[in-house]
């Protein structure tokens, strides 16, 4: 399936283009649109309605990045890290620069005493679960979705980039949209891939896509 990166400045119609591409690529499988902020999610919903006679298409799902990680990647395969289906939600209580000393594979690295996923380790856990389950996380996504669209990729950081790399290596269609001049937020404060931001981050995605083609 196609892998695409669109670098678009504010006001260039990137939301229209993303939604139009999604509608044109509908198949018997679902399509997933992911964005970082709730504001971005609402913008996608409104644009999709405009292009589909005022209603959201039943085969198009829209989620924020953390909802995607929690519901589509972590919860279905939490048995690979905990004994019971005990994971609740994602905790954003970690302070900037907080060091996590638990080793990879130790459930306490990813999960708080309240059974919430540590936000800084959410994408790392998704990556770990896919690896530990021999690719079941990605295989499930391939079964459910034909295309995954990720808006606001300039806000991704840390292990997010490794997980996107895994998506780009899959049989899914992947469509990334970003604007390095609008990098306002960061999904986490992990030091992983800390040298990749702004223009360097988008160049990183360009290189990844070139490798997969």
Task: Indicate where each model-derived feature is located.
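Conserved catalytic network of the ASCE P-loop NTPase/AAA+ motor domain
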Residues: 25-26, 139-141, 167-170
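Conserved RecA-like helicase ATPase core segment
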Residues: 165-213
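A short acidic, amphipathic alpha-helical/loop segment
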Residues: 17-21, 47, 137, 159-167
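Loop/turn-to-beta-strand initiation segments
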Residues: 30, 146-147, 171-175
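P-loop NTPase Walker
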Residues: 1-75
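Conserved ATP-binding/catalytic motifs of P-loop helicase motor domains
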Residues: 74, 78, 154
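Short catalytic-loop micro-motif centered on adjacent basic/acidic residues
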Residues: 33, 147-151, 213
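Accessory N-terminal region flanking or inserted into the helicase ATPase core
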Residues: 2-6, 79-149, 158-159, 163, ...
